[in-house]
Amino acid sequence: MNGTEGPYFYIPMVNTTGIVRSPYEYPQYYLVNPAAYAALGAYMFLLILLGFPINFLTLYVTIEHKKLRTPLNYILLNLAVANLFMVFGGFTTTMYTSMHGYFVLGRLGCNLEGFFATLGGEIALWSLVVLAVERWMVVCKPISNFRFGENHAIMGLAFTWVMASACAVPPLVGWSRYIPEGMQCSCGIDYYTRAEGFNNESFVIYMFVCHFLIPLVVVFFCYGRLLCAVKEAAAAQQESETTQRAEREVSRMVVIMVVAFLICWCPYAGVAWYIFTHQGSEFGPLFMTFPAFFAKSSSIYNPMIYICMNKQFRHCMITTLCCGKNPFEEEEGASTTSKTEASSVSSSSVSPA
């Protein structure tokens, strides 16, 4: 084995010289230069500095403006809530531990950080599944006269939390476990060991199949059908141009969210699967650190995509920030009006950009 396994940790370095120490008790500066921990702390501070305001603003603006409280926006708000969980439960913890060079908060802190990071990522994934299914139901109309309403949105929200909890909770109760990973100042699922009594193998397979592959298959199926339906509707002119444009633009926004999710999380999933299937192989601490912390940037991109692609939301946000006035009133107002009109005939009741 090209690593050192101890009680509730695995360090990717063989302890031939006796310098390897528990990541809960000693700085891990023998793994990488101390400057790397300082850089990691600065990166986490940047994510907090950006992630909290933008996600909080998304929640506040939607609550403040009644016209934004549409059923589909409930799912988008769910993403913002999940991101705030990651910011407060994960990013602050990681910033603090990286400043010390090891997981100074102990086992309890590791469990909490790993739980919030996993929960936030899974809520984001299952929210994208709900959005994809909603787009498929609205645009492809497998059920005649289906309208995505408030009850559907609430059921979708409940579904995302149940599924995310089904992935994040088991390691807290003995099916697998959360351990420090990478530079040993953040925690994740134990892909590294076959520790007796934790059934890591079965949990990792369950997680990859049920909480990564199946959601992605559903998303790709829905958007494959959606693209076909949009082309057919455009060719047959079955709906007004306004309705078609509204549906296309909402769908485009959600597709971009899905692509951004894949860009952020696929490297982490790929590295985790490699480590799981090559346990005992040689790899450095940065091998998991880079994809893990790149994935954490997902807390920023969804609200950014929503703000950039939804002119009605952007108009409301500027109005809120400027104390009820929009300095770009003429151009933003015109766009907002047109989009709101498009939304009124759109069966999704969403005002896209």
UniProtKB/Swiss-Prot annotation:
Post-translational modification summary for this protein: Phosphorylated on some or all of the serine and threonine residues present in the C-terminal region.
Disulfide bond entries: 110-187
From its record, what is one biological process in GO terms?
absorption of visible light
Protein name, as recorded: Rhodopsin
Membrane topology classification: Multi-pass membrane protein
Q: Where is this motif: 'Ionic lock' involved in activated form stabilization?
A: 134-136
Q: Which residues lie on this side of the membrane: Extracellular?
A: 1-36, 97-110, 174-202, 275-286
| Key word Zinc present | no
Question: What is the recorded function of this protein according to its Swiss-Prot or TrEMBL entry?
Answer: Photoreceptor required for image-forming vision at low light intensity. While most salt water fish species use retinal as chromophore, most freshwater fish use 3-dehydroretinal, or a mixture of retinal and 3-dehydroretinal. Light-induced isomerization of 11-cis to all-trans retinal triggers a conformational change that activates signaling via G-proteins. Subsequent receptor phosphorylation mediates displacement of the bound G-protein alpha subunit by arrestin and terminates signaling.
Q: Where is the composition biased (Low complexity)?
A: 334-353
Matching entries from InterPro entries are given as:
GPCR_opsins, GPCR_Rhodpsn, GPCR_Rhodpsn_7TM, Opsin, Retinal_BS, Rhodopsin, Rhodopsin_N
Q: Which residues lie on this side of the membrane: Cytoplasmic?
A: 62-73, 134-152, 225-252, 309-353
List of residues that carry N6-(retinylidene)lysine? 296
Care to name a GO molecular-function term for this sequence?
11-cis retinal binding
Q: Record's family? A: Belongs to the G-protein coupled receptor 1 family. Opsin subfamily.
Key words of the record: Cell projection, Chromophore, Disulfide bond, G-protein coupled receptor, Glycoprotein, Lipoprotein, Membrane, Palmitate, Phosphoprotein, Photoreceptor protein, Receptor, Retinal protein, Sensory transduction, Transducer, Transmembrane, Transmembrane helix, Vision
Positions of the region Disordered? 330-353
Kindly give the PROSITE patterns that the UniProt entry links to this protein.
Answer: G_PROTEIN_RECEP_F1_1 (PS00237), G_PROTEIN_RECEP_F1_2 (PS50262), OPSIN (PS00238)
Instruction: List residues traversing the bilayer.
Output: 37-61, 74-96, 111-133, 153-173, 203-224, 253-274, 287-308
Positions bearing carbohydrate = 2, 15, 200
* One Gene Ontology term, aspect cellular component: membrane
Is the keyword tRNA-binding in the record? no
Question: Where would one find the signal peptide in this protein?
Answer: none
Compartment annotation: Membrane; Cell projection, Cilium, Photoreceptor outer segment
Species, as recorded: Mugil cephalus
Q: Where is the lipid attached (S-palmitoyl cysteine)?
A: 322-323
